[in-house]
Amino acid sequence: MVLYFIGLGLYDEKDITLKGLETARRCDKVFAEFYTSLLAGTTLEKIEELIGKPIVRLSREDVELNFERIVLPEAKDKDVAFLTAGDPMVATTHSDLRIRAKKAGVKSYVIHAPSIYSAVAITGLQIYKFGKSATVAYPEKNWFPTSHYDVIRDNKERGLHTLLFLDIKADQNRYMTANEAMEILLKVEEMKGEGVFTPETLVVVLARAGSLEPTLRAGYVRELINEDFGRQPHVLIVPGRLHIVEAEYLVEFAGAPEKILEEV
């Protein structure tokens, strides 16, 4: 039979596309994972009510280590839906799952949905000017990742914007805020000292993208690091070289200081 990778969109249960909803309703079994992203405006129960079916929620271990044991056997003789926040193929994990399905002889289809990669356009920053993205992860006892700093540096050298995803530890109910991400990046700056991310760096914060009232703020790190952006999920953007229209948009819609108009 068929395994459908279905995106749920960005914020609540109403973000799923009509095609995705109709397909999920037709499926014999429905699985979902929420450890790669957060749908802040809904609950599993609301999604179940909309689809009209019970949903089996999978953990990171279920998906990454036991997909062949839990999901693929069901898809051998049933139509199965695998629901994910955002667009299903944005997460590398899901691309790997589709490869595994093909190797197991299971046919699969992808049904897209709104993604942060498109919603970030609400910042007014031009999509084609974004460079490589990166994730700011929580440091651990013997591990302090710094690759995101290098990505920002490389993008800045090319005049490109950097979209930073913020760490999610769903099993611990920990969702990194933009404030925490800025603090981590300042610590990396102290370690590396390359002037890539300082209190004078211009940043853009987007919170709850996809909701009717997202928070959009732009300013210097020293101004925003203690600001309350409301509930997660948050993303942090470090702009590269700004076009005048981008700068004007940030001033008008994100409260950026007018000083940035003089710097373009």
Curated annotation (Swiss-Prot):
CDD domains: DHP5_DphB. It comes from the Archaea. Its EC number is 2.1.1.98. GO terms for molecular function: diphthine synthase activity. InterPro entries: 4pyrrol_Mease (IPR000878), 4pyrrol_Methylase_sf (IPR035996), 4pyrrole_Mease_sub1 (IPR014777), 4pyrrole_Mease_sub2 (IPR014776), Dphthn_synthase (IPR004551). S-adenosyl-L-methionine binds at L10, D87, V90, S115, I116, L166, A209, H234. The keyword Methyltransferase applies. Pfam families: TP_methylase. Pathway: Protein modification; peptidyl-diphthamide biosynthesis. It catalyses: 2-[(3S)-amino-3-carboxypropyl]-L-histidyl-[translation elongation factor 2] + 3 S-adenosyl-L-methionine = diphthine-[translation elongation factor 2] + 3 S-adenosyl-L-homocysteine + 3 H(+). Keywords: Methyltransferase, S-adenosyl-L-methionine, Transferase. One of its GO terms (biological process) is methylation. Belongs to the diphthine synthase family. Homodimer. NCBIfam families: dph5. S-adenosyl-L-methionine-dependent methyltransferase that catalyzes the trimethylation of the amino group of the modified target histidine residue in translation elongation factor 2 (EF-2), to form an intermediate called diphthine. The three successive methylation reactions represent the second step of diphthamide biosynthesis. This is Diphthine synthase. It comes from Thermococcus kodakarensis (strain ATCC BAA-918 / JCM 12380 / KOD1) (Pyrococcus kodakaraensis (strain KOD1)).
